[in-house]
Amino acid sequence: LYLFGDTAAETTSNQSQVDLGWQAVEAMKLGALIVLFVLIGVANLVVVARQARRATWKELLSPSILALVFFALAGAGVVADLRGILKIASAQLSVFITPLSIAGLIWGFLVVLLWRARFFTRGTVAWNLLNILVLIVLVALGSMEPEQSIVTGDHLAVLMALGVTAFFVWFGIRQAVANDERMKAGQKPWEALYAEKVPTWPDLVYIEAICAVIVLGGLVLWGLAVKAPLEAPANPAVTPNPAKAPWYFVGLQELLVYFDASIAGTVLPLLAVIGLLVLPFLDSNPKGCGYYTLRERPVAIAVFLFGFLGLWWYLILVGMFFRGADWAFVRYSPSATEELEVAEAANTLSAIVWEKCLGISLFREADRLPRVYRYVLALGRELPGILLLGAYFLGLPWWLARNLCRQIYEKLGKGKYWFLQLLLLTMLFIPLKMLLRWLCNLSYVLALPEWRLFF
């Protein structure tokens, strides 16, 4: 009895210590959030003060409102339950978070960014967008439970890489807009004003040495401050759920939701690498070489940004932050920490056409037939998918070569034109397949398990 009593008391003491530890972590996190809210609010006031004389009231309105929002959140953290407020705010936002809405937001923003590039490259607009993104991230972090508040190394790497990518994309488009304005006025681009000879010794070596020291120091601080995302030793009796790949491969894992493993893991990455390798040989346009420009290369820039940001980065973000157990889409609510959307069983195109639209179930009896007849019947079953893919990958390039893309066809020649169309149509097939999965619950356009072929 004494032993059991001592064990119970020790267990209660350990539990109380754990609770006190989580309370300390929660207090530190809320304190850090309040400090960040105050600092960002002060930064917005500094922007307003510096732009007060030369900016209009419309340009000063948004940073003023953002400063009030951040100061209000900081004040709420002092006098009220900040995490409760942030949980309610994140719950209201999570209602609109779906794979379709995230993709639509990214794709739509890319379209508007290229359409109104001059507007979005202004400093005030970029500052407002940065404030909104930081506010969303802080609200998401502040609304988590204490045991979920630790940001892993993979998550931190993704956030940092996304921030660096967004900055350099914005900076490149800003340089392109500036060069377009100069060339429109009859001047040379900024890059043409640089000296033909750039000193490399010792000027460049000094810069490289300083950068190497800074990067090494950053890696040391990273290793000391951030816990490495290492899993426990492998146990054949325990399977992690979800078992996620590293952040640089999680995009391919997310692509498995929409494509077969042979397509998502082999064919599509291989075509992406081949496309990047042969791009200099397919694109012989001398414009835009050596300087930033948007007006002279709109199609090339739009295709690259859509493939890199609209597809690859979308897959990484959804796979890293919005996939839970059984790879179900995760959303947050005020009643439960996370809710998993249970996906319905997807249908193939042949099942939708023959069974749902025409009411024909003849192909279900194919297993009783001899093997030769099963193969013939399988081709007849997948006839809608074969015709659709043939029209997309063969008929559409043939029609474009005789109408909209006649000049490109004559300039590139037959071989280069068809190879370029194969790369472009394959890339565009990825978002089309996503839309078909979201809107029509379509799994495969072509499903031939007899030959282990799924597309």
List PLM regions with ranges.
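Short, strongly hydrophobic alpha-helical membrane anchors
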Residues: L1-E26, L141-M144, R452-F455
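Inter-helical loop and helix-membrane interface segments of multi-pass membrane transporters/permeases
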Residues: E10-V18, V79-L93, P146-E147
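Hydrophobic cores of alpha-helical transmembrane segments in multi-pass integral membrane proteins
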Residues: A27-G84, S94-M144, D154-N179, E191, ...
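Extended, regular secondary-structure scaffolds
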Residues: M183-Y194
